[in-house]
Amino acid sequence: MEEKYLILSIESSCDETSLALFENNKLIAHKISSSASAQAFHGGVVPELASRYHEHNINRLFVDILNETKIDPLTITHVAYTAMPGLPGCLHVGKVFAKQLASLINAELVPINHLHAHVFSASIDQELVFPFLGLVVSGGESCLYLVSDYDQIKILNQTQDDAIGECYDKVARILGWNYPGGPIIDKNYQEDLATLEFIKSQPAAKNFSFSGLKTAVINYVHNSKQKKLDFDPIVIASSFQKFAINEVIKKVKYYLDLYQLKRLAIGGGVSANSLLRKKIRDLNVISYIPQMIYTGDNAAMIGAYAYALIKNHKKSILIK
């Protein structure tokens, strides 16, 4: 008979405060509170503001989960939390809460690598089969991994400058659109209007790099304004998205072929992008794609990954 675990998981790496409760691999409660609307006023994430929102929300979300599930907190066996990477102040709030709670209820503490949890975000409601290629595309990172086991995750490629999600936000901002920029650009995407070529494509084996694309788009808009030339934001946004997503897909194909892999898992905020999801599904591989609610930062992916580690007597690798 399988041992019963009751796992509380905590995510606080950036601007989402999230808690989830798992009974083994079954998600029984999940709460997310985002400070994105407050951050939008500043055009991006302000770390101190995000930390304060975590402090304000984390206790409330825990109480909400207790009220919703009617569980006795003393029955919680494990407290999993995002240990890295992320904004230091935000991580600190989650870590302190997790440590204090675990100490009070005598639960085991489980630190989790946030990026690796993104790799396994699709495992919340489906089984992932090893080995597979893992793609994480978010506001903080763009990474590709060779995943052979829950604790055998080899980095193959990662961003050498700006992450793809950050570039989405910056491009949206220069076009006068709100934060976060990714959903807005994706919503306005029109393939037949993606006619601009800002920069040349890079070789697939090179590290992810989006700063050149971001700078080229910003310069294009600035130059157009200075010369009082008309420009269409939809054309610019569509051209940006088409190039950025094609760069990701090119690298995915390269590493699938290089390692002769037939499975691909994706995660991170940009994995919600409709063009990326379509192109992933068009690949001749088995694709593990998370539900939309699990693409951004969330405690469900932390808890699902924590359970897999606990069950298999493994620990999260606390390096990128």
Swiss-Prot record:
Catalytic reaction list: L-threonylcarbamoyladenylate + adenosine(37) in tRNA = N(6)-L-threonylcarbamoyladenosine(37) in tRNA + AMP + H(+)
State whether keyword Cell inner membrane applies: no
Sorted keywords for this record are: Acyltransferase, Cytoplasm, Iron, Metal-binding, Transferase, tRNA processing
Cofactor(s) demanded: Fe(2+)
Signal sequence span per UniProt?
none
This protein's source sits in the domain of life called Bacteria
Q: Which positions are annotated as binding substrate? A: 136-140, 169, 182, 186, 273
Q: Which GO terms describe its cellular component?
A: cytoplasm
Localization per record: Cytoplasm
Q: Which Gene3D superfamilies match?
A: 3.30.420.40
Write out the GO MF terms: iron ion binding; N(6)-L-threonylcarbamoyladenine synthase activity
Q: Where does Fe cation bind?
A: 114, 118, 297
GO biological-process terms attached to the record:
tRNA threonylcarbamoyladenosine modification
Bound how, and how many: what does the cofactor note say? Binds 1 Fe(2+) ion per subunit.
According to the UniProt entry, what is the EC number of this protein? 2.3.1.234
Q: Which family does it belong to?
A: Belongs to the KAE1 / TsaD family.
Q: Which NCBIfam families match?
A: gcp_kae1 (TIGR00329), T6A_TsaD_YgjD (TIGR03723)
Q: What does this protein do?
A: Required for the formation of a threonylcarbamoyl group on adenosine at position 37 (t(6)A37) in tRNAs that read codons beginning with adenine. Is involved in the transfer of the threonylcarbamoyl moiety of threonylcarbamoyl-AMP (TC-AMP) to the N6 group of A37, together with TsaE and TsaB. TsaD likely plays a direct catalytic role in this reaction.
Which named protein is this?
Answer: tRNA N6-adenosine threonylcarbamoyltransferase
The organism is: Ureaplasma urealyticum serovar 10 (strain ATCC 33699 / Western)
Point out the gene that encodes the protein.
tsaD
